[in-house]
């Protein structure tokens, strides 16, 4: 019996790695940031060359989130809606699948004291809207998985989280 009937796992190149400006705690960025459409084109090239079959992203890697317009992805004429369609067309053309969609609560200063576990109900609502947007974007791209990344969501900073108020 031949078990090697094609790819058994996806080789993936995520948006955040391709778009990294190469900064770390020891120094600032050494590269300029790429636009998400340019990153998609690099990922598509890697797919066409046979290096990868899939990609993943944090929502903010594709289109920045604006708490004043938390459902901008639903408006096809919005900058976010247009950019998402452009990125999808580039990836689809190269046959690159989206493996996982990840919400970047950890990357937004608004959620520094937690997102879904923030003691402030207004902040929790915004975090939920951001997660819902990421789920919609993932569905749009046909993502197989959604990752809830709890980094900096308050659980690892018990000193700033008022646990008795978390679920009020």
For the regions a language model picked out, list residue spans one by one.
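N-terminal pre-domain/capping segments
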Residues: 1-140
């Amino acid at each position: 019996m031949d078990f090697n009937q094609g790819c058994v796992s996806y080789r993936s190149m995520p948006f955040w790695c391709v778009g990294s400006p190469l900064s770390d705690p020891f120094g600032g960025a050494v590269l300029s940031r790429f636009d998400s459409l340019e990153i998609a084109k690099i990922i598509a090239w890697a797919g066409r060359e046979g290096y990868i079959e899939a990609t993943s992203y944090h929502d903010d890697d594709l289109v920045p989130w604006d708490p004043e317009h938390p459902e901008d992805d639903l408006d096809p004429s919005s900058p976010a809606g247009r950019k998402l369609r452009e990125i999808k067309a580039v990836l689809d053309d190269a046959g690159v699948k989206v493996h996982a969609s990840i919400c970047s609560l950890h990357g937004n200063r608004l959620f520094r004291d937690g997102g879904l576990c923030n003691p402030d109900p207004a902040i929790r609502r915004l975090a939920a809207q951001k997660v819902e947007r990421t789920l919609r974007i993932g569905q749009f791209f046909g993502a197989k998985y959604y990752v809830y990344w709890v980094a900096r969501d308050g659980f690892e900073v018990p000193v700033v989280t008022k646990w008795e108020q978390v679920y009020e």
